[in-house]
Swiss-Prot record:
The keyword GTP-binding applies. The gene is tuf. Monomer. Residues 10-205 form the tr-type G domain. This is Elongation factor Tu. It catalyses: GTP + H2O = GDP + phosphate + H(+). Residues 62-66 are annotated as: G2. The keyword Metal-binding applies. It comes from Mycobacterium sp. (strain KMS). InterPro entries: EF-Tu_GTP-bd, EF-Tu_GTPase, EFTu-like_2, EFTU_2, G_TR_CS, P-loop_NTPase, Small_GTP-bd, T_Tr_GTP-bd_dom. Residues 19-26 are annotated as: G1.
Length: 396
């Protein structure tokens, strides 16, 4: 029995199961927790299928999503695993980023091969920037014909290649059900799958290693000291006496120096990703900076007004619009901390977008917003969320 010791220093990786309905995503998730629990009992608890399947509701950017989070460890890594039971839940999660993925396990039933949702999930994974996909060919115990299973594997590889994923990614034949029942051969298959996950999904770049960015939530003046901007550091690290740049909302950018970093009324040497801090800025007046701008490492982020996005539009039942929208729709786009009005252009051949649809759109904002590809936003009408999306391409 291999002993793995608990280390907080293990790399932490977020993964998820994706694929067509009834191909066994949730069963596989349960099988992984059971197999790893049996292999490293002191590191893992086992989660039954129905515990995962009854996914709790979460609200993310005003959208309700059913999603299950389980965690487990291999010898090498600590994993947080998300499983969205319904197809609509999966799409909403991918677009709103309720649960970010560093990699995904694409579950394909060997008995069926790739199905419409398989393709849709892989396409979405590409659009929302999931870095890596590997494959679990599930229900492999139910296919005796080696040629048939090889054919399915080829189809899956073609599907990955078509979306620029690694077509040589591991494809592991598993039977989640048999593994849950304790069948030795198939337990081993799930262990092999997790070895492949350990080896092939790259270590994520930690937020603290990326260039500094903090969205401005509030601005106030401290008499005798100057102007303070507050917010939660989104990524990177900022040190006292470092130069920063204020970007977005207004034309041009402003450079300044951080003369102090405060958290909970204590002075710090630095603020890092995840911290809620106040930054004291040299030579900046209260009216020079406003909510909705971002403070960044100079030259790392630029303001833009024109972009393409992939969006999910809430259905009427979810509190969204009751009617479709058409070309030149003008809602507000909520980026990080503020709303900016924009004009929507629909893709060629799309007349209208119905509540409950997901679609690509092009947007022209009336004010520039600091953005990178992958940035998420909500679509709002008078403060009410009617959709969510992410930037897929920046034009200007």
């Amino acid at each position: 029995m291999a002993k793995a010791k608990f280390e907080r220093t293990k790399p932490h990786v977020n993964i998820g199961t994706i694929g067509h309905v009834d191909h066994g995503k949730t069963t596989l998730t349960a099988a992984i927790t059971k197999v790893l629990h049996d292999k490293y009992p002191e590191l893992n608890e086992s989660r039954a299928f129905d515990q995962i399947d009854n996914a709790p509701e979460e609200r993310q950017r005003g959208i309700t999503i059913n999603i299950s989070h389980v965690e487990y460890q291999t010898e090498k890594r600590h994993y947080a695993h998300v499983d969205a039971p319904g197809h609509a839940d999966y799409i909403k999660n991918m677009i709103t980023g309720a649960a970010q993925m560093d990699g995904a396990i694409l579950v394909v039933a060997a008995t069926d091969g790739p199905m419409p949702q398989t393709r849709e999930h892989v396409l979405l994974a590409r659009q929302v920037g999931v870095p890596y996909i590997l494959v679990a060919l599930n229900k492999a115990d139910a296919v005796d014909d080696e040629e048939l299973i090889e054919l399915v594997e080829m189809e899956v590889r073609e599907l990955l290649a078509a979306q620029d994923f690694d077509e040589d990614a591991p494809v592991v034949r598993v039977s989640a059900l048999k593994a849950l029942e304790g069948d030795e051969k198939w337990v081993k298959s799930v262990e092999e799958l997790m070895d492949a996950v350990d080896e092939s999904i790259p270590d994520p770049v930690r937020d603290t290693d990326r260039p500094f960015l903090m969205p401005v939530e509030d601005v106030f003046t401290i008499t005798g000291r100057g102007t303070v901007v507050t917010g939660r550091v989104e990524r990177g690290v900022v040190n006292v006496n470092e130069e920063v740049e204020i970007v977005g909302i207004r034309p041009g950018t402003t450079k300044t120096t951080v003369t102090g970093v405060e958290m909970f009324r204590k002075l710090l040497d630095q603020g890092q990703a995840g911290d809620n801090v106040g930054l004291l800025l040299r030579g900046i007046k209260r009216e020079d900076v406003e909510r909705g701008q971002v403070v960044v490492k100079p030259g790392t982020t630029t303001p833009h007004t024109e972009f393409d996005g992939q969006v999910y539009i809430l259905s009427k039942d979810e509190g969204g619009r009751h009617t479709p929208f058409f070309n030149n729709y003008r809602p507000q786009f909520y980026f990080r901390t503020t709303d900016v009005t924009g004009v929507v252009t629909l893709p060629e051949g799309t007349e209208m977008v119905m509540p409950g649809d997901n679609t690509d759109i092009s947007v022209k904002l009336i004010q520039p917003v600091a953005m990178d590809e992958g940035l998420r936003f909500a679509i709002r009408e008078g403060g009410r969320t009617v959709g969510a999306g992410r930037v897929t391409k920046i034009h200007k």
